[in-house]
Structures are given as C-alpha cells and as structure tokens.
Amino acid sequence: MVDNKVYLSVSDLNFYISQKFKNDPYLHKVFLQGELSNFRFRMNSHQYFSLKDEKSKINVVMFRSFFEKLKFKPEEGMKVYVSGYVDVYGPQGSYQFYAQTMEPAGLGALYEQLRQLQEKLAKEGLFNEEHKKKIPLFPDRIAVVTSASGAVIHDIMVTANRRFPHAEIDLYPAKVQGDEAADTIVAALQQIQAQGDKYDVVIIGRGGGSLEDLWPFNEEKVVRQIYAMQMPVISSVGHETDTTLADLVADARAATPTAAAEYATPNLVDVLTQIVQLRARLYAAVQANIHTKHQILDRLKNAPVLQEPTRIYDQQIQQVDMLIHRLNQAMDNRLQHDGSTLRLLQERLKALSPSRKLEQLERERNFVVSNLFSTMNNYLKDQRNRLNRAMQQLDDISPLKTISRGYVYTTDQKGNIVTSVDQLKIDEKLKLHFKDGQVQVNVENIRREKNGNQEK
C-alpha cells in the first residue's frame, strides 16, 4: 500500500501559520486595550511584556525604536492603548503581538503622563530657581506668543500701552490648542530666539481650558524650548488654578494675560514718582555730605599741628638731646672707672719689690693697659658712631634750628672744626659760625677745664 501522507517540518508549519497571519487583513493593524503585565524595563533594549484583561492575555514585543518614541514611562498594572500587528515567532511556534504605539488609557492617563514628565524634567533641574532669569525693569521690546485671534494679545497690548507706552510689542502667532499647537509654539519661540537680543522679554500664554486644551503647554518640546530661551519668559497659561509645565519652567508666571503685561512693564506714573523722590533724597544726601566735609575742613584748619608745623619735630629734637647727654655721661663714667682701675694696678705694682714679680706685674700691666686701651678705643669708637648717628638724626631734622637756639661751631683757618682747646694756639685766627653769619676772632688766652671746672 502506497503511503501518500506528506510530513511537514516544524519550521514549515510555523512558516505556514505565519503567512496566514500576514495575509489576514484584520491582523495587519490591530488596536488593543488592556493592562500591562510582567513588565520589566530593559535599558537600551527591546521590551517584552504581556497585555491582559479579565479573561485572557497575550504576549507583546515592542522594539526599541518604537519604545523610545513613547511620551510616558510604562509601569506594571497601567491600563494602556496599543496598536500593532500579530505574527508568529518561528523558533518557539508561538504567536505574539508586536506593539508599535502605546499611550495611557483615559484622562487619568494624561495626568499620569504629565506626572512622569514633570518628575523627569525636575530631576534634570529645568524647574530650579537658579536657572530663572531676571525680568528687566524697563523693556524696550516685548515678544508675545499666543493666538492672533484671541483676547490674550488684546489684553496684553492694552495693559502694556497704558503702563509703559515706550515698549514695542510684537506678536508671534501660534496655535494654542490641538495636535499642531506644540510645533507652532516651538517654531515661534525659535524665531524669536534667532533674532538675538532684539527682545528683552517674551510672554507666552492663552486663556483657560481643560487639561486636553492646555496640553500643548505640557509638551516636552515646548518646555525645553522655553528653558533654552536666552531672554526671560513670562508664562500666562489658563486660569490661576491651572498649572502647566510651561508655568514651572518659565522665569515668571502670571495668573492672567493682564497680569503678565503688568509683570513685564513698569508703571510709568510710579516710575516718575520714584524718580522725583530719589532726586530729593539724592540732593539731601549731597548737601549733608558737603556739610560734613566743611566741618572736617574747619577742624583741620584749627588743628595745632597746622598752626605750628615746627612742633612736629619737637619730640625728636628732645630725644636727640637726651641721647647726647646719656652718651657723654656714659663716656665720663667709663673713663673714671678705667682710670681708677689703672691707678689701683699701679699702686699694687709699686707694693711688689721682687724683680720677677715686677716683671710679671709689668706684663700684666701691659696686658691690662693694652686691653684697656683696646676696650676704650672700641667703646669710644662705638660711642662716636652713636654720637655721629645721633648728630646725623639731629642734622636731618633741622641743623639750622639747633644753631637758632644759640649754639655756634668753630673752625680754624683750614676749615677744620675745633672741638678741643688742645687744637688751639695763642694768636691763632678762628671763625665762629652763627645761624646768620660768621665772626673771625683771635685766641688771646687758653684755659683748660675738666667737667666744667678750671684745671689747676
């Protein structure tokens, strides 16, 4: 008996079933809703999970290129809408759903998507206060991004022209609702940015509405573009109770378009009033400062040091006189002490008669005398140096003032200063130097004195 059975391989069967799925038009584009199950996020990879309802579930694959386009972060148990196609995975012979799009289900999904995006951008620091730019006090030009037909631009222009007519306002129209709104808002902001520093501040806004109506101002692309603006942005989206991500990232938020215009412009009347007040305060401060400086000048004019400038050096002159006196006294005391020592040694030498002792004493005397003269010479040299320095200080201060107190100095015919009577001879001609001239005298008598007493 001939066996007419045809046996297929497992691969052939899986391929056949796969072709059935691909040829079925109902499975080319399938839209599903369900709850995410077994979802485990895989970094930089394809995502594998299940989609289930109350009665059954199906395995789902979402390739990395599709997953990276999602505007929210899927989580376990989240209800979602997905679209894609059904096919067979050949190696295992199992069919599964290949998801191409995914979005949260219902209005709650929008809030969840908003929450996730807000957390993401907050972690990046887009809402931090340190990134907020200061609104200029006196803007020259203001750019407004809103609908060209709404009441927003009218309220802004009326308020700004009333408060600060100097400011020029330019409208950059954009759709503020619908699927294309986010792209037009971003395009308008980029157009403003491309003009450099033409504008001082930007106002972006629209009137109130539902979450879906305000959704363009929650789009990530809009938030990032506001953050990237080089000039400050004031957001006025919806009513005061509405808060969008555009409000959080903007440099300032206003509850209404009118409030936004007030935020962007100063009140000219208030500014003029402040100028008048500041002018009065400035004038008073200047007058007070001038009065204070006059008082200081009067005190300086009456200061003793300016009335008698020479008194500045009185203390230094007294110090020099005191040093000279102490130097002379020290030299006299040292000479008296050393003279007494010498005389004592001479007496002791006379008391010793043996020649050897005499020779020894002679050597000791010579040694002592040598040391004495060396010490005296060194001491005198040191004292002379100190005296010279003191005299130099005195001379630096005012040598003429020393002469003006009645002092004179004497020179011989060669111009040498005479400091001792030992330098003089009878009938020798000398010059006495005064502060206002010189006198020539002859030596008639020479009398030596020691310590102020005439020598006998």
From Swiss-Prot:
Enzyme Commission number, as recorded: 3.1.11.6
GO MF entry, a single one: nucleic acid binding
Any one Gene Ontology cellular component term annotated for this protein: exodeoxyribonuclease VII complex
Domain of life per record: Bacteria
UniProt-listed CDD domains: ExoVII_LU_OBF
Chief subcellular location: cytoplasm
Catalysed reactions listed for this entry: Exonucleolytic cleavage in either 5'- to 3'- or 3'- to 5'-direction to yield nucleoside 5'-phosphates
GO biological process: DNA catabolic process
Pfam family, one: Exonuc_VII_L
Keyword tags: Cytoplasm, Exonuclease, Hydrolase, Nuclease
UniProt KW Hydrolase keyword: yes
Signal peptide from the UniProt entry: none
InterPro entries reported in the protein's UniProt record: Exonuc_VII_L (IPR003753), Exonuc_VII_lsu_C (IPR020579), OB-fold_nuc-bd_dom (IPR025824)
Intracellular or extracellular location(s): Cytoplasm
Subunit structure: Heterooligomer composed of large and small subunits.
Family: Belongs to the XseA family.
PANTHER family: EXODEOXYRIBONUCLEASE 7 LARGE SUBUNIT
Function description: Bidirectionally degrades single-stranded DNA into large acid-insoluble oligonucleotides, which are then degraded further into small acid-soluble oligonucleotides.
Protein name: Exodeoxyribonuclease 7 large subunit
Gene: xseA
